[in-house]
Amino acid sequence: MEFMKSLSGHDALLRIRLGPVRAYVVCEPGLVQQMLREPAVFDKGGMLFDKARQIVANGLATSAWTEHQRQRPLVQPAFTRARLEAYAPVMAQETDALIDTWQSERPVDIVEQMVTLFARITARTLFGSDLDRASIATLQQALPVVVEGVYRQMTAPLRMWEKLPTAANRKYHRAAADLHAVIDQFIDELEGVQGDRPDGEDMLSALLEAREGQDRLSGAEVHEQIFTFLMAGIETTANAMSWTLHLLARHPEVQERLHSEITDALAGQVPTLKDLSRLEYTRGVLTEAMRLYPPVWLLTRATTADTSLGQWRIPAGSAVAFSPYMLHHDARLFPDPERFDPDRWCPPRGDKASQRGLFPFGGGARKCIGDVFSLTEALVALVAISTRWRLTPGPGPDPRPVAKLTLAPDRVIAVAHPRPSPRDGHGSGRR
């Protein structure tokens, strides 16, 4: 990550070597926006995405532009505002259930807890309330292994690497089989009762509805989209929240201001989407954490035709990349870029111009389809945690960013201190 940060402030376009591939790195947000506005020319492809498709198939995150154009309108109904309104209470319930287990003045493994939380939220919003705890436990155990295995195979110099009978490969293949089995089992169960079941508010119901009509998702495509949501939806939000809670523990003045805004606005009530839109400082805290530690730290494209970015000509078949992490640490875009400053995003300082270099979920027509869902679940969780607990740094060193598929902290340990309940004035944590 220090290498990416060192590129901040350089010329608009650089040529570097990424492993065996020579790539253009875009360092200027205006050129990044141009690239994202031309998804047919700057398509998902090249060595990494070609490998990814062989591993995780052809979901929205990896599909070529022509296929993405067909799939996205069919998947979009799973992420409507009405469905988000229905998901919010589930997000709050799962967060409360998790933080009920925290103990006063005891260390909390934040990374492990956030993975657990967002695995449960994703499982319930994806599959509905019928998903049993054993299946959720399988998802929690299998997903980190699969994510690690996918990254290892995508970056392996030789295709045969994944065929070697190593312990890591055997563990990956077992975890992937478990994950696919859970997905298939629940699709089969839901299809079997769909005619006798009221319209579901879960994502899988929306995807199964997308199998109706002339242009529809096939059964294999429904499976691929669910696999993609699980791969992308849990780790990214868990990492974003882990970094956010780490920063809050290290900045008590920010944490107290956040708590005051939440208490004044909600008084302990579960927030609606409208409530969340009014929590300006709370949203600023999360946005600033994702500026410093964007869940997606590197995005790559492959040119499908001869083209240009600004004054630079780029031949067809070229690898083109940009790093949200690099742009987010560019002092030309964000003065004093290493400072954790949520007020960057709040009135009177926050405006559209300040967001032109912000890319935590990519951008353009291929921006993450679940960005609003991810922000909503993170905000709901942040509200619930900040209402009931105050965090201070735990023992050990500060976390170190680890760049894999996402930008993960190697560890975050915080000590939890109960806060008085806004409703009754009593401590809300277990003692």
Residue ranges: model-predicted function:
Residues 1-11, 181, 269-310, 331:
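Conserved cytochrome P450 K-helix E-x-x-R motif and the immediately C-terminal K′/meander segment
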Residues 1-5, 17-22, 29-34, 39, ...:
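Cytochrome P450 catalytic-domain helical core, especially the substrate-recognition surface
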Residues 2, 12, 53, 80, ...:
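Conserved cytochrome P450 catalytic core segment spanning the I/J/K helices
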Residues 41, 322-350:
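Conserved cytochrome P450 K-helix/beta-meander segment immediately N-terminal to the heme-binding cysteine loop
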Residues 84, 193-196, 273-280, 368-370, ...:
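Conserved, non-catalytic sequence blocks in retroelement Pol enzymes and Pol-derived host proteins
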Residues 236-261, 371-389:
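Cytochrome P450 catalytic-core helices
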